[in-house]
Amino acid sequence: MNEERLLKVLVGPHVSEKATVLADAANQHVFKVAPDATRGEIKAAVEKFFEVQVSSVRVVNMKGKRKRFGRFEGRRNNWKKAYVTLAAGQDIALAGSE
């Protein structure tokens, strides 16, 4: 795959309580990804940039929340997140983890 495309696939890590528990217990990491990214592209990007073996990728399309801005009602953008399961013995050291 094109390296330029792989740079655009991963938007960043998704940090939440659930993501932290999954990273510790099930060796799964959660990433925000491009809305048009495929499972294969996500797997290739994680393997290339973090130098780990990926065993599976699950993808979820998240609907944007409705929010109020003063008296106006607006909507956040829809986005996509990926649950990446690493092979046994593999680990990703993200900032803030020990």
UniProtKB/Swiss-Prot annotation:
One of the record's GO cellular component terms: ribosome
Key words, A-Z: Ribonucleoprotein, Ribosomal protein, RNA-binding, rRNA-binding
GO biological process: translation
UniProt keyword rRNA-binding, yes or no: yes
Organism domain of life: Bacteria
GO MF annotations in UniProt: rRNA binding; structural constituent of ribosome
Family to which this protein belongs: Belongs to the universal ribosomal protein uL23 family.
Subunit structure: Part of the 50S ribosomal subunit. Contacts protein L29, and trigger factor when it is bound to the ribosome.
Functional description taken from the UniProt entry: One of the early assembly proteins it binds 23S rRNA. One of the proteins that surrounds the polypeptide exit tunnel on the outside of the ribosome. Forms the main docking site for trigger factor binding to the ribosome.
Protein name: Large ribosomal subunit protein uL23
Organism annotation: Thioalkalivibrio sulfidiphilus (strain HL-EbGR7)
